[in-house]
């Protein structure tokens, strides 16, 4: 399974949905893991950390192309078009989106 991690786009969100350690375990279990370049920067996790874990560093389009997409925050309206037939694992925070 290809598991992908796009960078978070919500203002002031510095977390990333998957650490290099977690990615390493998924890779060891036979999964392909792709992380958007710079996605871990706000959490002091470098692209080199992910590369050492066996992750492929990709652009935003590829980061949304996985069989399973991991995010911390709910998708923003700008990200809605990227929600096609993929599985998304995230917190939805539905009440936070109320007008």
Explain the meaning of each model-derived region.
Residues 1-99:
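Structural/interface elements that position substrates and couple domains in central-metabolism enzymes
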